A protein has these predicted regions:
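Short, compositionally biased strand/turn segments
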Residues: 77-85
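N-terminal, post-signal-peptide region of Sec/Tat-exported proteins
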Residues: 41-78
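Sec-dependent N-terminal signal peptides
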Residues: 4-15
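Hydrophobic beta-strand residues in large extracellular and virion-surface proteins
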Residues: 58, 65-67, 79, 149-153, ...
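Non-cytosolic coordination micro-motifs
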Residues: 20-52, 84-185
Length: 185
Protein backbone atom coordinates (compact mmCIF):
# COMPACT_ATOMS: atom_id res chain seq x y z
CA UNK A 1 0.00 0.00 0.00
CA UNK A 2 2.83 2.35 0.88
CA UNK A 3 4.53 1.69 -2.48
CA UNK A 4 1.29 2.50 -4.31
CA UNK A 5 0.93 5.81 -2.45
CA UNK A 6 4.54 6.77 -3.18
CA UNK A 7 4.16 5.80 -6.84
CA UNK A 8 0.95 7.84 -7.17
CA UNK A 9 2.54 10.83 -5.43
CA UNK A 10 5.53 10.76 -7.78
CA UNK A 11 3.24 10.30 -10.79
CA UNK A 12 1.10 13.31 -9.85
CA UNK A 13 4.22 15.40 -9.16
CA UNK A 14 5.59 14.57 -12.63
CA UNK A 15 2.23 15.35 -14.27
CA UNK A 16 2.05 18.65 -12.37
CA UNK A 17 5.58 19.62 -13.45
CA UNK A 18 4.80 18.73 -17.08
CA UNK A 19 1.56 20.70 -16.98
CA UNK A 20 3.43 23.80 -15.83
CA UNK A 21 5.98 23.72 -18.63
CA UNK A 22 5.82 26.65 -21.06
CA UNK A 23 6.44 26.46 -24.79
CA UNK A 24 9.79 27.98 -25.80
CA UNK A 25 10.89 30.11 -28.74
CA UNK A 26 14.63 30.14 -29.50
CA UNK A 27 15.19 28.57 -26.07
CA UNK A 28 13.20 31.31 -24.30
CA UNK A 29 10.07 30.16 -22.43
CA UNK A 30 6.98 32.04 -23.67
CA UNK A 31 6.11 33.57 -20.31
CA UNK A 32 6.53 36.72 -18.29
CA UNK A 33 5.93 40.31 -19.25
CA UNK A 34 6.37 41.80 -22.70
CA UNK A 35 9.37 43.79 -21.43
CA UNK A 36 11.09 40.74 -19.92
CA UNK A 37 10.51 38.55 -22.97
CA UNK A 38 11.69 41.24 -25.39
CA UNK A 39 14.87 41.78 -23.36
CA UNK A 40 15.60 38.06 -23.72
CA UNK A 41 15.04 38.28 -27.49
CA UNK A 42 17.42 41.24 -27.68
CA UNK A 43 20.06 39.21 -25.84
CA UNK A 44 19.66 36.55 -28.58
CA UNK A 45 20.52 39.13 -31.25
CA UNK A 46 17.08 40.37 -32.29
CA UNK A 47 16.58 44.09 -32.93
CA UNK A 48 13.37 45.87 -31.92
CA UNK A 49 11.66 47.69 -34.80
CA UNK A 50 8.50 48.89 -33.08
CA UNK A 51 5.70 48.30 -30.63
CA UNK A 52 1.98 48.75 -31.11
CA UNK A 53 -1.05 47.37 -29.24
CA UNK A 54 1.04 44.97 -27.15
CA UNK A 55 2.59 43.44 -30.25
CA UNK A 56 6.33 44.02 -30.44
CA UNK A 57 8.09 43.45 -33.74
CA UNK A 58 11.68 42.32 -33.91
CA UNK A 59 13.81 41.60 -36.90
CA UNK A 60 16.09 38.62 -37.04
CA UNK A 61 18.12 37.28 -39.90
CA UNK A 62 15.44 36.61 -42.52
CA UNK A 63 12.22 37.19 -40.65
CA UNK A 64 10.19 39.53 -38.51
CA UNK A 65 9.14 38.20 -35.11
CA UNK A 66 5.99 39.47 -33.43
CA UNK A 67 5.46 39.01 -29.70
CA UNK A 68 1.89 39.15 -28.39
CA UNK A 69 0.91 39.81 -24.78
CA UNK A 70 -2.22 40.46 -22.76
CA UNK A 71 -3.70 43.96 -22.87
CA UNK A 72 -1.73 45.02 -19.79
CA UNK A 73 1.53 43.65 -21.23
CA UNK A 74 2.11 41.45 -18.19
CA UNK A 75 1.77 38.06 -19.86
CA UNK A 76 3.29 37.03 -23.21
CA UNK A 77 1.25 34.25 -24.82
CA UNK A 78 2.34 33.96 -28.46
CA UNK A 79 5.23 34.51 -30.83
CA UNK A 80 4.75 34.80 -34.60
CA UNK A 81 7.56 34.51 -37.14
CA UNK A 82 6.84 36.25 -40.46
CA UNK A 83 9.20 35.45 -43.30
CA UNK A 84 9.81 38.04 -46.00
CA UNK A 85 6.93 38.19 -48.52
CA UNK A 86 7.47 36.63 -51.92
CA UNK A 87 5.68 36.72 -55.25
CA UNK A 88 7.14 33.33 -56.18
CA UNK A 89 5.15 30.21 -55.33
CA UNK A 90 8.26 27.99 -55.43
CA UNK A 91 9.99 30.22 -52.86
CA UNK A 92 6.99 29.97 -50.53
CA UNK A 93 6.62 26.20 -50.90
CA UNK A 94 10.35 25.55 -50.54
CA UNK A 95 10.49 27.63 -47.34
CA UNK A 96 7.34 25.92 -46.01
CA UNK A 97 8.66 22.43 -46.85
CA UNK A 98 12.04 23.18 -45.26
CA UNK A 99 10.51 24.24 -41.95
CA UNK A 100 7.93 21.46 -42.04
CA UNK A 101 10.78 18.97 -42.36
CA UNK A 102 12.69 20.59 -39.47
CA UNK A 103 9.67 20.61 -37.15
CA UNK A 104 8.78 17.05 -38.13
CA UNK A 105 12.30 15.91 -37.29
CA UNK A 106 12.10 17.64 -33.92
CA UNK A 107 8.46 16.98 -32.91
CA UNK A 108 7.35 14.08 -35.10
CA UNK A 109 4.51 13.93 -37.58
CA UNK A 110 2.25 17.02 -37.50
CA UNK A 111 -0.98 16.69 -35.53
CA UNK A 112 -2.72 18.12 -38.58
CA UNK A 113 -1.50 18.98 -42.06
CA UNK A 114 -3.39 20.21 -45.10
CA UNK A 115 -1.70 21.38 -48.27
CA UNK A 116 -3.88 22.49 -51.16
CA UNK A 117 -3.54 25.19 -53.78
CA UNK A 118 -6.67 25.04 -55.95
CA UNK A 119 -5.06 26.71 -58.98
CA UNK A 120 -6.05 24.95 -62.20
CA UNK A 121 -2.80 25.89 -63.90
CA UNK A 122 0.71 25.24 -62.66
CA UNK A 123 1.95 28.72 -63.55
CA UNK A 124 3.36 31.05 -60.90
CA UNK A 125 0.72 33.67 -61.77
CA UNK A 126 -2.18 31.23 -61.27
CA UNK A 127 -0.72 29.86 -58.03
CA UNK A 128 -0.04 33.33 -56.59
CA UNK A 129 -3.50 34.54 -57.65
CA UNK A 130 -4.96 31.82 -55.41
CA UNK A 131 -2.72 32.97 -52.54
CA UNK A 132 -3.89 36.56 -53.12
CA UNK A 133 -7.55 35.47 -53.10
CA UNK A 134 -7.04 33.61 -49.83
CA UNK A 135 -8.10 30.24 -51.24
CA UNK A 136 -4.79 28.48 -50.58
CA UNK A 137 -4.79 26.15 -47.57
CA UNK A 138 -1.22 25.26 -46.77
CA UNK A 139 -0.61 24.52 -43.11
CA UNK A 140 0.66 22.08 -40.52
CA UNK A 141 0.44 22.10 -36.74
CA UNK A 142 2.21 20.27 -33.95
CA UNK A 143 0.81 19.82 -30.45
CA UNK A 144 3.91 19.99 -28.26
CA UNK A 145 4.65 20.17 -24.57
CA UNK A 146 3.46 23.58 -23.40
CA UNK A 147 1.40 24.57 -26.44
CA UNK A 148 1.29 24.31 -30.21
CA UNK A 149 3.29 25.37 -33.24
CA UNK A 150 1.56 26.24 -36.52
CA UNK A 151 3.29 26.60 -39.90
CA UNK A 152 1.43 28.07 -42.87
CA UNK A 153 1.54 29.97 -46.14
CA UNK A 154 -0.51 33.16 -45.83
CA UNK A 155 -1.56 36.06 -48.02
CA UNK A 156 0.57 39.15 -47.43
CA UNK A 157 -0.25 42.81 -47.98
CA UNK A 158 1.42 42.99 -51.40
CA UNK A 159 -0.43 42.20 -54.62
CA UNK A 160 0.09 38.55 -55.57
CA UNK A 161 2.44 38.01 -52.65
CA UNK A 162 2.43 35.51 -49.84
CA UNK A 163 4.57 34.68 -46.85
CA UNK A 164 5.43 31.76 -44.64
CA UNK A 165 4.31 32.18 -41.04
CA UNK A 166 5.16 30.19 -37.92
CA UNK A 167 3.06 30.69 -34.76
CA UNK A 168 4.09 29.56 -31.28
CA UNK A 169 1.21 29.58 -28.78
CA UNK A 170 1.78 28.86 -25.10
CA UNK A 171 -1.25 26.90 -23.86
CA UNK A 172 -1.12 28.12 -20.24
CA UNK A 173 -0.88 31.79 -21.14
CA UNK A 174 -3.47 31.53 -23.93
CA UNK A 175 -5.88 30.00 -21.42
CA UNK A 176 -5.12 32.77 -18.90
CA UNK A 177 -5.82 35.40 -21.59
CA UNK A 178 -9.10 33.70 -22.53
CA UNK A 179 -10.16 33.63 -18.86
CA UNK A 180 -9.35 37.35 -18.51
CA UNK A 181 -11.30 38.11 -21.69
CA UNK A 182 -14.25 36.05 -20.45
CA UNK A 183 -14.22 38.02 -17.21
CA UNK A 184 -14.40 41.25 -19.25
CA UNK A 185 -17.54 40.31 -21.16
Amino acid sequence: MKKILITLTVLFAVIDIMAQEHLSFKGIPIEGSMTEFCQKLKSKGFTSIGRENNITLFTGRQATVGVTATDDGKNVFAVVVLFDPSGEWNTLVNTYDYYKDLYTRKYGKPTISKENNPAHLDSNTALMAEVHQGTVVYGSAWEVTGGDIQLSIEKSSGVYEGMVMIRYRDSQNIEAKIQNDLDDI
